[in-house]
Amino acid sequence: MIDTDILTTLPEPIFNDGMAEVIKYGFISNPEIIDLISAPDFKQNMERIVYECVQIKRDVVQADERDTGLRMILNFGHTIGHGAEKVGHFTELSHGQAVAIGMVQAARLAVKLGETDLVEQITSICQAHGLPTELPYPMEDIYTAMLHDKKRAADSINFILVHPMGKANIHPIPLEQLHQLVTAE
């Protein structure tokens, strides 16, 4: 049982943090969620929004209980996001803020790799929900922090990229290539 009425008691910054994860679910699996949260009166649909997000997580976790394949898509925005949290000593950015920034950065990385350009869509919806979209730290520092990410596999990091909207894919990116991509302007 989920009581969505509790959401009305949250301070706006905490509510917005949660919206970063909602945005993630919309981009990785169900674009209808993005449509719902784009409406000015989206809070009237919170039961449906939460239901859709829980369904996605349930389906993904049931399909990959050991987090060795499909379940990795739940980490969209988290690779760079966790790096940013680490660089900020886990005090300067909230988790939701870091994930929002990470989703935008992952979309920029996807463009550099020739994938679908969702940068503007992700940036716009994050900003509409009071979330930051730009890294407050040098990308070199984020890259160094990402070297310790759980998605690292030997000489690559499994990055979650979205293309097209509603479909997340796991992209193993060699560390050397990743360094070049994320530090190049």
Annotate the PLM regions.
Residues 32-140:
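Active-site segments that bind and position negatively charged phosphate/pyrophosphate groups
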Residues 5, 77, 166:
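Anionic group-transfer/hydrolysis microenvironments
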Residues 14, 20, 116-185:
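C-terminal charged capping/lid subdomain of soluble metabolic enzymes
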Residues 1-38:
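A glycine/threonine-rich phosphate-anchoring loop and its flanking beta-alpha core
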Residues 9-10, 83, 168:
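Residues that scaffold the ATP/ADP-binding catalytic core of kinase and kinase-like folds
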